[in-house]
Amino acid sequence: MKNTQSKTKDFSFKQFKIAGGYSGMPVSTDGVLLGAWCDIKQANTLLDIGTGTGLLALMCAQRNPDCVIDAIDIDQHALQAAKENFTSSPWSSRLSLLEGDVLSFPFETSYDAIVCNPPYFNSGEHAQNQQRATARHTLTLSHEALLERCFKLLSADGQAWFVLPEAEGRMFISLAETLGWHLAGLCEVQPTAKKPVSRLLIQLSQHASNAKIEKLIIQKDNGYSDEFVALTKAFYLKM
């Protein structure tokens, strides 16, 4: 049967390529920011939840040459695209795909790090494309269930990183704290200095610490800010 869904545009980075296939989710600035910001240099094992095309897993594999990475997704089209992207990357031997629901999957290990670009639309009109709907709406994975599952999957000193729109991110942090998490780091992302915070990069830990709060402005003076370039230059071709 012919696939009637449109293909997602491919995207090339400095050390790997993302072929979107029919995954329904193109490469986003959100994902790139999270993959560049999360501090996973001490992690030996990492789980990418809802990997989609595999962007976060690939960025983490590039950044940490010793980390073994599992990437899980429930969507067949996403898994097909991620498999192609993992196989064509320089780090295929350290990348494994898991098919299934993260809430019920029988994981055989705990993880030093978890990264996730979670669904965030809790209500309103659903995305027209079913793959995009699953990726963007909390239809199949509530934030509470996600946080509880991540808490159980982390190793004793593990950390988890997420990216969410500002309003949803504040609620996510509050919910996390009621479930026993502690905020370890937060980056407030602004498109420009004159625009409000649009995204939150969130670092959570099972142990209390002084949270590092920082800001990132993406564009300044009709170009990218020095901070944005410094954060993403290892990945973007034209940085």
Regions found by a protein language model. Name each.
Residues A36-E108, A113-C116, N122-A127:
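Conserved SAM/SAH cofactor-binding pocket of Class I
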Residues I18-A19, S23, V27, L141-V197, ...:
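Conserved Class I SAM-dependent methyltransferase catalytic core
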Residues N3-T45, T51-T53, L58-Q62, L200-Q203, ...:
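SAM-dependent Rossmann-like transferase core, predominantly class I methyltransferases
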Residues K17, V68, R94-S96, H182-G185:
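Conserved beta-strand segments of alpha/beta enzyme cores
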Residues P118-A145, R149:
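Mobile active-site "lid"/loop adjacent to the S-adenosyl-L-methionine
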Residues L34, N117, L146, L204:
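Residue-level signal for inorganic ion chemistry
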Residues K195-M239:
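SAM/dcSAM-binding transferase cores
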